[in-house]
């Protein structure tokens, strides 16, 4: 039987590293298309010798993208950024990049394309991130009508940039900020469940043309997530309400840092709930039981406790 090839753009990122391992176990030959292949070599041990190959293919480079998808049966686009820097813009990566991948996949005769977007993607949204994701979805649907689109809520897991960031802050600061009072609602989804969902769409032709919104089994306010975090790391910290206006003003200065902890665009995103829409196709429609936050957090946040994994049970 001929080898099945899948190209994963952005495959060295948080979701990508979980997806690549799953695809390798399903006997796919995996091309990991990234900007810097040398930073994706850590993925090779997830498969057999020669099964996982990093290749240089930035989504803004049509020639490199064309080469990366040639001969592939399936393509996954995970390429994304959380803030803009230099040539890396939301429009360039999320919109034009997605269009480039979709057009190249269609021209190469790829059988299945999976576009990973985000809950709240809307080309008329309040934040540029959401607008670029929405524009990307529209471009993909035009170029490759049979593409499956997945929209996760905030994704959590060992390498996440959400719980890890606030847990690290709680080690140093006596207070955690509640932007907008902490009332924004989220439906955190486990990275393993997201990877399973993508793998199903890669493997199952029946998923073509469908849009799925991926969330966990429960909805939380931002404040509830911070309370859950503090219980898990066994620390007491002040939860300080931070008005949207003040947060956006301060984020303007934080954006000047090489790796900004907060941007004005992210503050604007927090003005909208990030939960699965009523009537949307979900993890359940893919045959996946969503994993609860409370099950996974103890497996990686214990290192933020006052005494690490050997912490005494008392709060400090």
What are these regions (language model features)?
Residues 29, 81-143, 147-153:
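Conserved Rossmann-fold NAD(P)-dependent oxidoreductase catalytic core, especially the SDR/UDP-sugar
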Residues 198-263, 276-316:
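Mid/C-terminal beta-alpha module of Rossmann-like enzyme folds, strongest
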Residues 42, 165-191, 231-277:
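Alpha-helical membrane-targeting segments
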Residues 28-38:
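Conserved glycine-rich Rossmann-like NAD(P)H-binding loop of the short-chain dehydrogenase/reductase
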Residues 161-162, 181-203, 210-213:
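Substrate-positioning beta->alpha
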Residues 37-100, 104-107, 119-123:
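NAD(P)H-binding glycine-rich loop region in Rossmannoid oxidoreductase-like domains
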Residues 2-28:
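N-terminal Rossmann NAD(P)H-binding glycine-rich loop of SDR-like oxidoreductase domains
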Residues 127, 148-167, 220:
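Flexible, glycine-rich beta-alpha linker
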């Amino acid at each position: 039987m001929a080898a099945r090839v899948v190209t994963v753009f952005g495959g060295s990122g948080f979701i990508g590293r979980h997806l690549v391992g799953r695809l390798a176990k399903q006997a796919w030959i995996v091309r990991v298309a990234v900007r810097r292949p040398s930073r994706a070599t850590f993925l090779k041990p997830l498969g057999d010798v020669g099964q996982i190959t990093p290749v240089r293919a930035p989504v803004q480079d049509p020639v490199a993208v064309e080469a990366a998808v040639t001969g592939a049966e399936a393509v996954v686009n995970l390429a994304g950024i959380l803030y803009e820097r230099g040539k890396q813009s939301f429009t360039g990566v999320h919109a034009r990049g997605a269009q480039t991948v979709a057009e190249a996949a269609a021209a190469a005769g790829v059988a299945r394309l999976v576009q990973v977007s985000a809950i709240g993607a809307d080309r008329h949204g309040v934040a540029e991130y959401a607008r670029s994701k929405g524009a990307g979805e529209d471009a993909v649907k035009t170029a490759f009508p049979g593409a499956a689109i997945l929209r996760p809520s905030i994704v959590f897991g060992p390498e996440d940039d959400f719980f890890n960031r606030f847990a690290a802050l709680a080690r140093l600061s006596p207070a955690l900020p509640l932007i907008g009072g902490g009332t924004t609602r989220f439906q955190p989804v486990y990275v393993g469940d997201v990877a399973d969902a993508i793998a199903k769409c890669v493997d199952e032709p029946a998923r073509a043309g469908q849009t799925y919104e991926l969330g966990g089994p429960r909805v939380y306010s931002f404040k509830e997530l911070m309370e859950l975090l503090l219980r898990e790391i066994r620390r007491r910290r002040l939860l300080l309400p931070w008005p949207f206006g003040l947060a956006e003003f301060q984020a303007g200065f934080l954006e000047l840092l090489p790796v900004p902890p907060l941007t004005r665009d992210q503050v604007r995103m927090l003005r909208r709930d990030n939960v699965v829409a009523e009537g949307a196709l979900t993890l359940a429609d893919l045959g996946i039981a969503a994993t609860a936050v409370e099950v996974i957090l103890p497996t990686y946040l214990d290192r933020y406790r006052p005494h690490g994994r050997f912490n005494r049970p008392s709060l400090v």
